[in-house]
Amino acid sequence: MKLLALIKTYLNQILRGVVIGVANIIPGVSGGTMMVSMGVYDTLIHSITHLFKEFWKSIKALLPYVVGMLIGILAFASLISWGLENHELPTNTLFIGLILGGLSPLIKKIDRKKIGPAAIIAFVLLFALIIWMGLQNKDSIQNADTIDMNAGQMLIMVLLGMVASGTMIIPGVSGSLVLMLLGYYKAVTGALKTFGHALLHVDFAAMGQPVLMLLPFLIGIVLGIFGVAKLIEWLTAKYPTATYCGVLGLVAASPLALLIQTNMGSLSVGLVVAAVITFAIGFAIAWLLAKHSKEDA
């Protein structure tokens, strides 16, 4: 029975990781927001910042989520791209449901009696930041499909990884949208698709070019995650109410920003019904995963 319970726990954590991973490759959707919605944000931040002090404990906590994120990114990159290109509204409402389904645990973290001017300002400013990002016209931004790699470009990829990873773990801020605004989104996601396809077909020769781009990007991601995680942990310890109000502003604005970014086209009854269904599915998934999380986030 203990073994079955352990397997169930790990599968639950891997599934959350899949959701977080998929969120990180969609412009306008935040992996950090999904961490909050899944009820694991504080646990993951603590494990990252205490990786060297509590090495095995942190590895044990992080591993299933990392595995899930890799599965989500590699397995669903093509599917999500297809969904956004052909069924953008239902795809985005799925993630809006995932966001809103996990809001309750975050709200419970805020001590309403301690809400003051600083907390209100943090909420308003960060809410406005996400709306501003949502208003950016992603269709007008030039994104190269491929990049010729050299020493200078590798350094740029490391820096991009640092910026993108930092935004990936800040709730409400989309690392993919930041990459798109900087003009590198198509190149990075294209490399991920190529690598995933080559891995699936065990084609080592085809892995060379995407690895050349993704490896320095991955190094930057690791460096960026540690830096931002340390900052977030310090803020939640020093200014918990203002910090969580700010996080709530980031998360609460995300569905609106995502809708702003969505190309509605010509709405039909079938499309609206599909959007409602995917929203309900996303909401239910987030609610259930947050409910069964060990962390009462």
Where are these regions (language model features)?
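Multi-pass membrane proteins that catalyze or facilitate reactions on polyprenyl-/lipid-phosphate substrates
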Residues: 2-24, 30-169, 173-297
